[in-house]
From Swiss-Prot:
It comes from Cercospora beticola (Sugarbeet leaf spot fungus). SUPFAM superfamilies: NAD(P)-binding Rossmann-fold domains. This is Ketoreductase CTB6. Keywords: NADP, Oxidoreductase. GO terms for molecular function: oxidoreductase activity, acting on the CH-OH group of donors, NAD or NADP as acceptor. It holds the Pfam family Epimerase. Its EC number is 1.-.-.-. Pathway: Mycotoxin biosynthesis. Ketoreductase; part of the gene cluster that mediates the biosynthesis of cercosporin, a light-activated, non-host-selective toxin. The perylenequinone chromophore of cercosporin absorbs light energy to attain an electronically-activated triplet state and produces active oxygen species such as the hydroxyl radical, superoxide, hydrogen peroxide or singlet oxygen upon reaction with oxygen molecules. These reactive oxygen species cause damage to various cellular components including lipids, proteins and nucleic acids.
Amino acid sequence: MADSLVLLTGATGFIGFRILIELLRQGYSVRAVIRSAGKGQWLESRLTAVMKGSDYKDRFETTTVADFVTDGAFDQAAENTSYIIHVASPIVSSDNPDDWEHDFKRVAVKGSIGVLEAAKRSGTVRRVVITSSMVGLFSPKALFAEPSEVPLNAESRIPEMEPPYAHKMLAYQAGKIASINSAEAWIKNEKPAFDLVHMHPSFVTGRDDLATTREDLRKFSSNWHSMQIVLGHKNPIGKPILTCHNDDVARCHVLALDPKVTGNQSFLISCSPEDGSEWDDVKKFVQREFPEAVAQGVLPNDGHMPTVNKGVRFDVRKTEETFGFKHIPYEAQVLDVVKQYLELPEKDEGVEISTTA
């Protein structure tokens, strides 16, 4: 119900902020979890800028949870809420592989289970939606190396990945796998009054309303997969071209709150690449739509990233049929980001609001 209170984690991130905007536009009241007062001030400033002219302030509040892995961390935040959308992922700064099992895997599991336990204790929550990833469903081999004999779907589950992890991406994947497996086991064992929905986006692309400068868009995020090519970077490490628009990700999360959507299931969010599609296709899109910016060197448009496993395929029919939409194609995803890049100043000349205090 659109007048219900939703607890949202991760609202200060690329995906979470877009979900916050969508919730408010659809009439929900939102209690956003922040980690510090400084984050709250920054979030409210960006919300004011994006939602200007919209009457939302009486439907938005923040609550501080400094440490997501503390027992009962979300209990107070979840009081009197009808839904929880858990988007936040562990914040990892260590480059020491010995830390990654804790930082990626244990923290991810603790956060998800903590949210579920808070939902149970609240006595009011009807559904929890957790943001996972395509890497929570499929092995690295299935995504990066093996053509799909049949399209991969959201019903897939894989065993947990144990350390050591060769690089951070594998540790991140281990966290996503452990999180979904643990959360589903918790639901099966606890049999709470609420249900659970997992969302599994591929590489998320699209306008980032948290960005205020071009410099912000050059920082690493999933948008960087395409923008690095537009900005002339040559990356020797390839990836499968599996992408989705941030608008579609937000839409799925919010529509999943509808009680008409059956709970205790997963949804894969990804557009279907056309045969022969490559990451470098972005160059022809940009040349066609922004020729002056290319000619002037604002968009070098001469980068490269290899496309691997062109034979991988996803079955997203359940997602599109349940939520009643067609995924935004890769071309539109990329052009939205490039258009925003050209609209923004190079650097922020105004007063900076701390995002770390």
